[in-house]
Amino acid sequence: MDRDSLPRVPDTHGDVVDEKLFSDLYIRTSWVDAQVALDQIDKGKARGSRTAIYLRSVFQSHLETLGSSVQKHAGKVLFVAILVLSTFCVGLKSAQIHSKVHQLWIQEGGRLEAELAYTQKTIGEDESATHQLLIQTTHDPNASVLHPQALLAHLEVLVKATAVKVHLYDTEWGLRDMCNMPSTPSFEGIYYIEQILRHLIPCSIITPLDCFWEGSQLLGPESAVVIPGLNQRLLWTTLNPASVMQYMKQKMSEEKISFDFETVEQYMKRAAIGSGYMEKPCLNPLNPNCPDTAPNKNSTQPPDVGAILSGGCYGYAAKHMHWPEELIVGGAKRNRSGHLRKAQALQSVVQLMTEKEMYDQWQDNYKVHHLGWTQEKAAEVLNAWQRNFSREVEQLLRKQSRIATNYDIYVFSSAALDDILAKFSHPSALSIVIGVAVTVLYAFCTLLRWRDPVRGQSSVGVAGVLLMCFSTAAGLGLSALLGIVFNAASTQVVPFLALGLGVDHIFMLTAAYAESNRREQTKLILKKVGPSILFSACSTAGSFFAAAFIPVPALKVFCLQAAIVMCSNLAAALLVFPAMISLDLRRRTAGRADIFCCCFPVWKEQPKVAPPVLPLNNNNGRGARHPKSCNNNRVPLPAQNPLLEQRADIPGSSHSLASFSLATFAFQHYTPFLMRSWVKFLTVMGFLAALISSLYASTRLQDGLDIIDLVPKDSNEHKFLDAQTRLFGFYSMYAVTQGNFEYPTQQQLLRDYHDSFVRVPHVIKNDNGGLPDFWLLLFSEWLGNLQKIFDEEYRDGRLTKECWFPNASSDAILAYKLIVQTGHVDNPVDKELVLTNRLVNSDGIINQRAFYNYLSAWATNDVFAYGASQGKLYPEPRQYFHQPNEYDLKIPKSLPLVYAQMPFYLHGLTDTSQIKTLIGHIRDLSVKYEGFGLPNYPSGIPFIFWEQYMTLRSSLAMILACVLLAALVLVSLLLLSVWAAVLVILSVLASLAQIFGAMTLLGIKLSAIPAVILILSVGMMLCFNVLISLGFMTSVGNRQRRVQLSMQMSLGPLVHGMLTSGVAVFMLSTSPFEFVIRHFCWLLLVVLCVGACNSLLVFPILLSMVGPEAELVPLEHPDRISTPSPLPVRSSKRSGKSYVVQGSRSSRGSCQKSHHHHHKDLNDPSLTTITEEPQSWKSSNSSIQMPNDWTYQPREQRPASYAAPPPAYHKAAAQQHHQHQGPPTTPPPPFPTAYPPELQSIVVQPEVTVETTHSDSNTTKVTATANIKVELAMPGRAVRSYNFTS
């Protein structure tokens, strides 16, 4: 028999380790063929779990059938696979990519999704405001921006940027077309007064410049307003609203033009619109345009910017436009009196409409009648203007070197953020090509065989890597066809991660393929490693599916796509790659080299010449034909010396580098080193110390994923978010109240709910330490003023119970109309209420019966306060324009409210722990008042993006518990041992604890992304440990021997898989996204490192100490099974031929027919050493001859060469004679041996009787006796000769 045909442990290099002389059938029986192990138990030659081995045999039979079918139809399988994979790849053309933050990182499910759905359903949009922000910082972190030059530079940038235009749909759009500005009252009669107000009321811009006269330069208007009779072009830089109003009132009175100036005066009075910017200090007192009324006009001293900015700034309407200091100044330091002494940044906010507000604003305007105006077009106009704003700032900084030299100016808008996310969300073709090229090169180099090109695997290995790339692309295409939307997480991570994990399957298959060239190779490969690959892919895909329960859309999509790709890779590894192996077998059989097999001639290996070992009466020729003649002539052939052949391949020879293999290293060096007592002690102590330290460090693990990590690094938006988070930590939020609540009767509960936010940390207070007024307080205040005016004029006799007189004021008449409202639709007015009814009581509680009638009047006649309240009342109150000369007393009643909000400003939120504490505090308030009967919820960026952390740890713990429970069941099914599964799960738990500790040391905070990686790490750790456990369970011997055999089998695939996965993960460092680098790249590398240490170092030692019992325990030999029975022979009466079951056909042809013994399979029991007699045989004689010079040596005293696997039994030949002869004498062993004498020479004489009955009742009886002698030549392979007698 050819020595290369002996089944061996797979070697990743394809090297045949000569020291490995036991076949896998004897020492890994259930791994190679569970049916043989089952037969051993049935015959009482071994004990073990019969159920477990039976189930394993069922698995193996199915995989063997699959392998046979694939090998038989290899070309067809490849053709169909290419068609299917190509079809799925076409699906990539339909892939959609989501890049907007709110589409990707907002938690799905739970209360947050219900709250957002309620907001969307009620008011038709999720966002409450759109902002264009600008931050200015200094280059020098120690410098301050609290000086006039910094504010003037800030002004120059803002003036240029806010003046940009955008041309869309044949229309020009500017800031005034889309900015958020206060509403103006409507008038009847003289329309131009209303037009003047609309042109003068500017956009709302939150800026520190509002503390100075220069802030007026931002307000415009673009073209000066001309008032008839007033020889002045009105601009906010020269406008004194109070004096202009007095002039107009006087002028129109002189001209006897009737106009309700009282309404305008009340409008200005309630908003505290006075002198505008005329009395504010100038940044440059020497500027000739600085008004004479400025307090520092012509002053030679620069203004004290810090003192002026302390406490915040006020806009032109002081009552409703107070910009908190924390919003406009960042990185502030104060003196003892609390005044600003130093600041690092200035911030301005241009407030824009939302897309729905802009759509509603222009829906009925002539400007868009020809456009087919839609909300989508409104959004496009808004986004285009924001892009132009950012572009204008960039161009200005390039032109104005003075500003760029001293300051950093960052612009941020939601449109710019969406653009840059969309730009970088597409996969990088260069990174993918580099990753594939490196993996292909690694596979080529590790699978290349320099000394034996025929048995090399580099070509099929490279084909396997390319197949994994193909199947990965097909899996992503299938995801696109299924409607799964891509995002930055999936496009940047999935291709590399899938390639790294998929190549692991290729190395496992090539490791098994490294065995000898055999006809049924494919089915045997799948029979051995198929269960491991199936388990590995299932555990990884299962981990991804489990991680999909993390309620973050971006990660949910990532997990689903990764799971689909893993299933695609599994199908390619079990169906397509074996077909490639089947085709490569033909190359091996043809004797062609691995590389350029079509270019080089057939490779002919030079035979090794060695001194012959000629046992007495034995003829042997390795791989030679043995002519069989009737006269029993024998031709002696020279034999090879296996001992010399063995020495030619030992390390240290001239070819030691080329012949190095991880399997040999694991068996001869690595595992024996691990099994030393002091190594075990140090490893276990180090492992326990690392575990304890990790558990302690994990208690300090913080939650958090900053928004800055979601933005590509080195972008302007990334720099803005870094400065904003570090210097401001400013956010806006809203407390939303819902429907199913009686607002008129529960006003005090609403007030208490609002007042409760005073005690919430990080909420900005007003100058008095309280909170800004919300809509109900402004509503009540307006009614209170009307009630006060009515009471005064009623006492003066300007109004009576039945009517009012011409000298009554407009507000008193409006109050009269409000007082007589009953609140009933069928009887809306009752004048009797004038004497008894009050608009508000002494506590500020609004009249409950007419609450919604009053609301209609307030929303229309106090529009500045209504808009400034940011209440977003829905349904929107009905309109009622009050006219003093209108005698209809009926006021329309608004619909009951189902949505209202209270605005709050938050500051100092620089990390997730602070935001999480704030969310918890506000959520507690929400739950508390929910119990009081007020349906409510908070809204805003902190709740949208950080809500996931409130339940993240409990959700992660629950998912991990379910995954570990499922893993316990799955591992138990694969290993068929509960104790082995428990050890694997314990190892995984320890690895998780170490990963938590490593996250703390690396500063990686716990968020949804690390949660997904932690769940995935369970599947990866299972793959590492289960492969070692499987080898341990299926090996024969004591624990240390089984660990040695297990590491010999698994070290190569594990190391190669980890290295290729590491290369693929390392390629993630090229991503422009910080979250990909920190949370995917770094954390996956940590998982691989922890997995490598625990699985390759700690777990083998754990198995050697408390590992489970082997599946099969031989009863006759400690380190191998008993020799299996030969295959029964089936005879055919009709054809006169005999068949060997599961073997090759034999014929009773002529004596001259030659036989090729080297094609026999050692795994076939019929070719093994015969040590038993089946029931159909009759044993007539057997004897055992022992050499006299043998002495027993204990295992401890045997030579060091026993560290290698013990030599295998070899077949000796026997001769067949026509007459019985005595057994031949046994030659002396060629060298001393340490093995028992019964292994040296075995002689068996079975007697076979065959009876044949013919139709003529004649019976022919033939009795044949064969003397079969088996000799074992140590330590090399036996020299064989066959002697037949009959």
Curated annotation (Swiss-Prot):
Example of a GO cellular component annotation carried by this entry: plasma membrane
Low complexity bias: start-end ranges: 1199-1216
PROSITE patterns, per the entry: SSD
Subcellular location: Membrane
Limits of the SSD domain: 428-583
Pfam families listed in its UniProt record: Sterol-sensing (PF12349)
GO biological process, alphabetically ordered: anterior/posterior lineage restriction, imaginal disc; axon guidance; Bolwig's organ morphogenesis; determination of genital disc primordium; eye-antennal disc morphogenesis; follicle cell of egg chamber development; gonad development; imaginal disc-derived wing morphogenesis
Ranges annotated as biased composition (Polar residues): 1141-1152, 1165-1191
Annotated segments matching region Disordered: 1116-1237
Keywords for this protein: Developmental protein, Glycoprotein, Membrane, Receptor, Segmentation polarity protein, Transmembrane, Transmembrane helix
Record bears the keyword Mitochondrion: no
Subunit comment: Interacts (via C-terminal cytoplasmic region) with CG5504/l(2)tid; the interaction is probably direct. Interacts with hh/hedgehog.
Function of the protein: Segmentation polarity protein. Acts as a receptor for the hedgehog protein (hh). Associates with the smoothened protein (SMO) to transduce the hedgehog signal leading to the activation of wingless, decapentaplegic and patched itself. Participates in cell interactions that establish pattern within the segment and the imaginal disks during development. In the absence of HH, represses the constitutive signaling activity of smo through fused (FU).
Protein name: Protein patched
Annotated organism of origin: Drosophila melanogaster (Fruit fly)
